[in-house]
Amino acid sequence: MAKRKISKAVLAYSGGLDTSIILKWLQDEYECEVVTFTADLGQGEEVEPARQKALDMGIKPENIFILDLREEFVRDFVFPMFRANAIYEGEYLLGTSIARPLISKKQIEIAHQTGADAVSHGATGKGNDQVRFELGYLALDPDIAVIAPWREWDLNSRTKLLAYAQEHGINIDNKGKPKPYSMDANLLHISYEGEHLENPYAEPEEDMWLWSVSPENAPDEPEYITISYKNGDPIAINREEMSPATILETLNTYGKKHGIGRIDIVENRMVGMKARGCYETPGGTIMLKAHRAIESITLDREEAHMKDELMPKYAKLIYNGMWWSPERKMLQAAIDATQENVEGTVKLKLYKGNVIVVGRKSEVSLYSEEHSTFEADDVYNQKDAEGFIRLNALRFIIEGKKQPERIKSLIGDYEETEVCRIETGSITICERIKRFFGFGKKTDKNA
């Protein structure tokens, strides 16, 4: 199929080997003008060098965009996701997945601003990111052209990439010393894939982990912190109010120090294969624990249970790149409605990889000490439980009377076996069972 004629393309550009080669390839293959977009999501690397690299490759200064998106990333993407307590397949806190919608959004905005008719990314044809990026592009601009070089070119090995870079005079720092892993980082996490991790039985080397100390080498003394919440979002640490990005940066500092947030998982990619990934999400791990703790005293029981039922669906939508979908927006509206009274303070103990909740309080707490006390109280009539239990057991009682053979299959024949002769008061256990289901005469009203 003939290539669509492209006049200008916005490239998600990091300044690294892959995207620098893509930049040159777009110029040669599509003969189009290229606009570079570099996002600062708190990945911990200098982003300004990408400007000079783009200039060196002939990009006009007005076509180079480097944006600090840290606050927007945490406020508008990370925090809403954490209101849902989203976890994919029980462990993954979606650090890569949640960054892609924002990058897609900014690329489309820049395309409209510069009059570009295409966008391009550096995701491979085997991973999830190609789907996440492109679903975002097409949700926000159905007419935009999408260029995915990894699905078009034949540069399918690092050797070929380096040869292409050398042939075209692309200056890549340390191009002869590739990183040992495929990595992605932002304020929420850092990920590692590839190399010896492709053997799912091989233990990661300790020097792979770049953010956190190992739990074994973490401080021998625990550290206590408090996190304050308002409308489901953290607003202060140790009573000091901070911006969203600063909140996450601060929690990352605590988590890294105490070896918190490391996971090693094999996940089911949306493209059909299983892939192993190692992740460090120190601040996010602390934040998730604290959020669930404050919800435990401020959410109604059924509200909390329904949220837990919705969470896997929500997490799957994020993982699969469906951030801009109607169903994600619908779920987000429902989740956000539950957060109106999720406010208060959580006290945490951080110790050798563990986040331990040791206290929680709220002015709108649904926890009532006078109702839940084990001591004498004047507000809870324990006799009220009898009717509640009888009503909940009504279907069991009817079933026991109408279908006695089924009950017998569950507890055996009603003979005074060795077990049944165990006495509780003046009657045996079997007699109690028979009376409960209406098979025996009840002579003791307290039985």
Swiss-Prot record:
| InterPro entries named among the record's database cross-references | Arginosuc_syn_C, Arginosuc_syn_N, Arginosuc_synth, Arginosuc_synth_CS, Arginosuc_synth_type_1_subfam, AS_cat/multimer_dom_body, Rossmann-like_a/b/a_fold
Q: What Pfam families does the record point to?
A: Arginosuc_syn_C, Arginosuc_synth
Looking at its record, which EC class is this enzyme?
A: ligase
Q: Where in the cell is it found?
A: Cytoplasm
Q: Which residues bind L-citrulline?
A: Y92, S97, N128, R132, S182, S191, E267, Y279
BP term (GO), one: urea cycle
What's the main place this protein lives?
cytoplasm
Residues binding ATP, per UniProt: A12, Y13, S14, G15, G16, L17, D18, T19, S20, A39, G122
Q: Which GO terms describe its cellular component?
A: cytoplasm
Disulfide-linked positions: none
Q: In which pathway does it act?
A: Amino-acid biosynthesis; L-arginine biosynthesis; L-arginine from L-ornithine and carbamoyl phosphate: step 2/3
Q: Which residues form a coiled coil?
A: none
Q: What's the EC number here?
A: 6.3.4.5
Q: Which UniProt keywords apply?
A: Amino-acid biosynthesis, Arginine biosynthesis, ATP-binding, Cytoplasm, Ligase, Nucleotide-binding
Which positions in this protein are listed as binding L-aspartate?
T124, N128, D129
Q: The organism sits in which domain of life?
A: Bacteria
**Partners and quaternary state?**
Homotetramer.
Protein family (similarity comment)? Belongs to the argininosuccinate synthase family. Type 1 subfamily.
Per its UniProt record, what PANTHER family does this chain match?
ARGININOSUCCINATE SYNTHASE
What protein name applies here?
Argininosuccinate synthase
Q: Which organism is it from?
A: Sulfurovum sp. (strain NBC37-1)
The lineage, from the top, is:
Bacteria, Pseudomonadati, Campylobacterota, Epsilonproteobacteria, Campylobacterales
